[in-house]
Amino acid sequence: MLNLESLFGSVLIKGWCRVDVQRLEEAWAARAGAREARLVAASHVPAALSLLGIVCPGDRLVAFADDFAEAFARGFDACDIVLVGDPSVAAFAAASEGFDVSFEVEGPHLWWFVNSIGGFGLCVPDLRTLGRAAREAHALLVVDNTVACVFGCDPLRLGAALSLEALDRVCAGKAPRKLVAASVARSQLKRHRVDAAAECAHALLEGCGLAKLDLTADEAGVLERGLDSLDVRMQAHFDRARALAEYLAANELVRDVYYPGLSSHPNHAVATGILEHGFGPAVEFDLIERSAGDLFDALPEEFCTSSAGGSTARLSAPRGKQGSTIRLFAGTDDPLVVASILDNALRKLATL
């Protein structure tokens, strides 16, 4: 275990300990393979992107986030927001037509936003192809890496100029408040070529004017311990997600099981080259003639109320409780027990 005080530094202020946040950001940047990182207190990644202030009036933000579109309805005033229906190069290129931009810091700027795993059906975009196409279009590719996390995907290596990640899972669901890490790509390419997109993103982040985040020692301790145990915990999340996906895929009481590790997933081939150590902690499926609310009522309460990123399997309803879609985030609990509880609830619904 790394020593928190020696790694991050601290000073005593009014009886409590305030952390040297810059050292903590440097530790995250090293883990993410980033040139620089910033920590932001925000409820989710789009909110953090807004708070950073790097997407400016006059910019165009093209985003694939069909399960989180409302997050882009606020915080991007005077920006041209375009939501696309799929995370393909063709969709992003079409939405970018007629917008004349460059990588000059003054702007305006063109932003492309995707999740490494996200959207309905848990899509996995081809980040390599998107990264190349973004640079050709003079766009800055931003990746929300929350679901896959830094353990399961390396967006900056694959071509993103900026990677943002909500730290719920990194902190094992124990963070006192919601935090997001924003990481900018290194600008040095092969053969001493400079990556203009990364240089632009770095300049924007440097000049954003956002004050350094205040973290208490307790908050920093949770994040430091989370980083120290991240690989072991995330491998457990990923392995349990695979087991639960295989159980659900064979279950006649549900349909349309989406998990990038299943050969039936439309992005399975892409995912094998984009994701690492497995295929993420999430599984999505649809109920047959029942609503998400019906299933939640038949399950123990902790399945729906446990902390995001924690050790207990957690279910949500991305289309609302009246919809039939369920998203399961595997914990580190016994997948056989989780499958048994799910099976009992599904069979109960089938008899009603």
Regions found by a protein language model. Give the residues of each.
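Conserved PLP-enzyme active-site core in the AAT-like
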Residues: L4-L7, L12-R18, R23, A27-A250
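Conserved C-terminal alpha-helix-loop-beta "cap" of PLP-dependent enzymes
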Residues: L253-A330, V337-N344
